[in-house]
């Protein structure tokens, strides 16, 4: 089975970025996804270029911070920050034109870094929200980049990065028997979503997921990869 161990939130803060790099260099993280509106993007890009074995994708955002583009009124509050939260499914959908404009701007900003765009996913899985399905399919095909699996994309296997995503490595699910849980999965490819990081002041101000990130670093650096993993 091909297993991709992806670290989300790259570039969110310096501490998160450092934790991801440690979980890659000293552990089993194989890829990460960069938030183009994060607080530590420039540093994250430098670290990625110093660690070329780390595959880097983009973590598309509509639910944290500020947009890259101007004039995307349906996406923002009066203070200029995104109006959507992790509870976006309870909210009215935005203008699809605004979503496409903003996500395209984020992808173009990524391409300016000189990094190779490996794959696409999103903060809080918002690309898996059914009103946005057509937008993510269009961008994946246009930029010729695979997307994190979601049930809304099950009829489009040609654009999915893997056949399945494992989201249970989170909160109380962070433990070192990860691969014992995975070995019975009957798929050829699977992505494990992770969130390693070190807690810094910026993270405390911008995320509710804190010290478990440091536990993730420790676990990801201690897990032994079984032979059946490609």
UniProtKB/Swiss-Prot annotation:
One of its GO terms (molecular function) is deacetylase activity. It is an enzyme of class 3 (hydrolase). Its cofactor is Mg(2+). One of its GO terms (biological process) is polysaccharide catabolic process. Mg(2+) binds at residues 59, 123. The keyword Hydrolase applies. Keywords: Carbohydrate metabolism, Hydrolase, Magnesium, Metal-binding. InterPro entries: COD_ChbG_bac, Glyco_hydro/deAcase_b/a-brl, YdjC-like. Its EC number is 3.5.1.-. The keyword Hydrolase applies. Probably catalyzes the deacetylation of acetylated carbohydrates an important step in the degradation of oligosaccharides. Belongs to the YdjC deacetylase family. Homodimer. This is Carbohydrate deacetylase. It comes from Oceanobacillus iheyensis (strain DSM 14371 / CIP 107618 / JCM 11309 / KCTC 3954 / HTE831). The lineage of its organism: Bacteria, Bacillati, Bacillota, Bacilli, Bacillales.
